[in-house]
Amino acid sequence: MSIFKDKIIESLKSVLPIALIVIVLSITIVPLTVGDMLLFIVGVICLVIGMSLFTSGAEMSMQPLGMKIGSTIGASKKIWIIAFVSFIIGIVVTISEPDLVILADQVGDNIDNMVLILTVSVGVGIFLMIAVMRIVFGWNLKYIMIAFYAVAFVLSFFLPEGFKTLAFDSGGVTTGPMTVPFIMSIGAGVSAAKAGADNRDDSFGITGLCSIGPIIAVMVLGIVTQVEGSGPPPTVTPEVETSRDAVLTYLHGFAEHIPDVAIALLPTVVFGVLFQIITRAFNKVQIIRLVIGIVYVFVGLTIFLTGASVGFVPTGETIGTVLAGYHYGIPLIPVSMLLGYFIVKAEPSVYVLNKLVENMSAGAISGKTTGFGLSVGVAAALGLSALRIITGLNIMWIIIPGYIIALGLSFFVPKIFVGISFDSGGVASGTMMSAFVLPLCTGACDQLGGNVMTDAFGCVALVAMAPIISIQLCGLAYKLKSRSRVRRFVMARETFVDYGYTHSEQRRAAAENRRRGGGSNE
């Protein structure tokens, strides 16, 4: 019970800043109706409860199941089994990812939803296979990233304009609440089964690699079909005048999302059952814990998605529309940055990432460090997205230089930060981006008379890119700080020798120096 209480407190810390920003906006420059505000407040409550249940359930079920599957296939001597199982897992977990379904609904009628979802799922399957092979054979992550992003940039020159933003957004939304816990745990499991000193570093980067697959797959789809999305249909905001209306609206939302979440969980559950039948990897107590965890995930994700879609989608669109009407849309930039800094903290997958980072780095890299890097990166990304909506700037003028910087930084930061940064990019662009930020951008774009597919779409892609840079900058600072500590330690030892201290005195002084922060963390 105390664990769930801690989860509630964590969720409150994440969601309340967003709620306060929206409330301040609603009583100043973005007036909301009483009905819309009521839906939003209930949505905040749903997000807090849903996130708490989801993160608790993911720790009980998705993570241990993924770890066990990863360690099992990682221990296999048959490469074709590792490759085939990884490919199937990638498709199975992605095909019903809620974030992907939300994006597909936003694209419009010109592109069939199921065609887009299947294309993205196959892309994830192929690149999960590549990611696992990288861990098994010890391939260098940065060179793989450089090669495949180069392929994506070349393909982008042959795409219709509207498909460029869609392709990069697809890479962002794929790594959502269903895929991240499972895929990252598989990476950790495969890495744990691999002997060698670098297995900790190799466990990161798997989500980042899986984000490239949908980008390239959707680009190929665009080149073949040569069509563009028509954009999202207008949001129909329910008329809410009484508390009864709000309750009925949310009950309708729950009814819609229960089957969606059940379908999203079903492939993972079926795969887990088959895995248990074949391997007998879990005992009875562990199986009961897994089942309880899956129930938590189901209930939590249903509540979370309902709160996001009913309470946050219309609010986001209203805020975007109103802000774009002030002073040529200039206020949209600072407000977007402020929202971006806090909204990433409300992503369920971010908690999973932070927890794994702390565990796999043995506490050397704290969740706070990762969270700060994510927040700064997302704030910058949404500021650039708002600038694009106002000016109509082509996304490739930001994407190409941004990834050149990100890939260039990978040569100067510790290896573990490279993998964490690319994982962070995929994790940051989750449910809240699809359910709140994308409607905000489309509302602003409509108000300014822009093209939704070329100007509003692409915000998720920028959100996925910016943390890659900001986390690596944190890694660069970590590296420089560690070097400084080493230099101070060496200078201290030289001083002891110069003044004729005995060996035991030198050791005691060196230990004291480390205790005060002068030692190396490397």
Q: What name fits each language-model region?
A:
Residues 158-166, 217-226, 304-311, 383-384, ...:
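Hydrophobic alpha-helical transmembrane segments in multi-pass integral membrane proteins
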Residues 38-39, 57, 105-117, 134-150, ...:
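Transmembrane helix-loop boundary segments of multi-pass membrane transporters
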Residues 1-56, 71-72, 76, 171, ...:
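Signature of multi-pass transmembrane helix bundles
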Residues 18-22, 50, 78-86, 147-158, ...:
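Small-residue-rich segments of transmembrane alpha-helices in multi-pass membrane proteins
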Residues 40-52, 111-122, 169-183, 235-236, ...:
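Structural signature of hydrophobic alpha-helical transmembrane segments
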